[in-house]
Design a protein with these regions (language model features):
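Radical SAM enzyme [4Fe-4S]-AdoMet core and its adjacent flexible, acidic
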Residues: 1, 6, 113, 134, ...
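Flexible loop residues that form catalytic
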Residues: 59, 92, 120, 144, ...
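Short cysteine/histidine-rich zinc-coordinating motifs and their immediately flanking basic loops
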Residues: 63-67, 363-370, 393-396
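Short Fe-S-cluster ligation motifs
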Residues: 75-91, 339, 377-399
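Short, well-ordered alpha-helical microsegments
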Residues: 97, 123-125, 188-191, 262-263, ...
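Accessory C-terminal segments flanking Radical SAM cores
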Residues: 258-389
Length: 399
């Protein structure tokens, strides 16, 4: 995940490097220190929607064998003892779990930063009140375009209106809310209008996710945004983030699932805002370190299986029913876990020779695996030109 606004604000209002790093950021200290990973927890696989890019291939049916309340509570205790700073409660649709607010309450009581990842369509006024009372630190709701586009992605007429209503209900109660948008060739044209909506509706955060090749996203990967379209989308997001930063407006722009974004941001700043200290920006991005899968980001699925991240369900390190998460996460006998924790990662192709490997970290291994069969091959989703990843003439920032 690239916290665009945080990076830009850090060079507009400089502070000592390493201060205020986001939970799960992939800085060197975080990689070697005692803090556990951010855990994205798919508590349930059932969902009232069947989205075209869903990585979990969720559907409106019950999936047997899911962790019950007691098991979830037990695992949370282990996660807390291991130093996990944040839980992202996801699905499926997590609000379909009858115990979701009990789980959220326990997470808050244990001191976790607790976020809810939802499609929003089930949130009416009473449920919004319960979300607010539960004390979620953040609620992310997906909007993959404007009305017609979003409803097509969701395969549900009226989904856009319900999700937008949920954003408004939660916002008006004082809950920090954000819009998640997965970029594809089919919805890129809606991005300017969606960014305008985020501004008009006073939404706290906008998260642009690149399409990752998991679940239905892999089935539909031919609809991934073309590289030119990807760059144009990022130009727009970066420009909005910079405009907010220079005006001192509190608005959080984030991108994810393509760690080349950090390198592209660095080039974008050099080109469009040359008065900023690009060498300091590079130092900040390098301290965050790019891809965090298997290191500072973890996933637990609905059955209790532990994965490197949410997109890699066909790579399992163990199950929290039979073994503590803390033991599973420290065990590097699995070759994928060992490779992800290795520094530097021994990736191949363009990734191996990239002059900005310290910023990107080798990008997303799932795409490489799905396209080539080799998890250490170059990421086919890297949209950077060869000259953009060659050695930079810019001097290194001295810390």
């Amino acid at each position: 995940m690239l916290r665009v606004s945080r990076a830009l604000n850090a060079i507009v209002q400089p502070a000592p490097l390493g201060k205020g790093a986001p939970p799960g950021s992939a800085g060197p200290a975080a990689r070697t220190g005692p803090t556990g990973p951010v855990v994205i927890w798919n508590l349930i696989r059932r969902c009232n929607l069947t989205c075209m890019h869903c990585y979990s291939i969720s559907a409106d049916i019950d999936f047997p064998g899911e962790l019950d309340t007691a098991a979830v509570m037990r695992v949370m205790g282990d996660l807390k003892a291991f130093g996990v700073p944040a839980l992202i409660l996801s699905g499926g649709e997590p609000l379909l779990r009858k115990d979701i607010f009990e789980i959220a309450g326990r997470a808050k009581a244990l001191g976790f930063y607790t976020a809810l990842s939802t499609n929003g369509t089930l949130i009416d006024a009473p449920l919004a009140s319960r979300v607010h009372q539960a004390g979620f630190d953040y609620v992310g709701i997906s909007l993959d375009g404007l009305q017609a586009t979003h409803d097509k992605f969701r395969r549900k007429a009226g989904a856009f209106d319900k999700s937008l209503a949920a954003l408004r209900l939660c916002r008006d109660l004082g809950v920090k809310v954000g819009v998640r948008f997965t970029l594809t060739q089919d919805n890129a044209a809606d991005l300017p209008g969606l960014l305008g909506l985020v501004e008009d509706e006073r939404i706290d955060r906008f998260y642009l996710s690149h399409l990752n090749y998991a679940g239905r996203g892999n089935v539909n990967r031919k609809r991934d945004a073309h590289f030119r379209v990807t760059r144009e989308a990022l130009d727009l997001v970066f420009a909005r983030a910079w405009d907010a930063a220079r005006r001192g407006v509190v608005k959080d722009f984030v991108t994810g699932n393509n760690d080349a974004d950090g390198v592209y941001l660095l080039h974008w700043v050099r080109k469009h805002v040359p008065e900023l200290d690009a060498s300091r920006l590079r130092a900040i991005l390098a301290a965050w370190g790019g891809n965090s899968s298997g290191v500072n980001v973890a996933n637990i699925d609905n059955l209790g299986n532990v994965h490197p991240d949410t997109m890699w369900w066909d790579c399992t390190f163990g199950n929290v029913r039979s073994r503590p998460f803390s033991d599973i996460w420290r065990d590097t006998r699995h070759p994928i876990m060992a490779g992800l924790k290795e520094r530097p990662r021994h990736v191949k192709g363009r990734c191996a020779t990239c002059a900005y490997f310290d910023v990107c970290g080798g990008n997303t291994r799932v795409r490489a695996m799905k396209v080539t069969g080799d998890p250490w091959a170059e990421d086919p989703g890297c949209y950077l030109e060869d000259e953009e990843i060659a050695a930079s003439p810019a001097p290194a920032f001295q810390v």
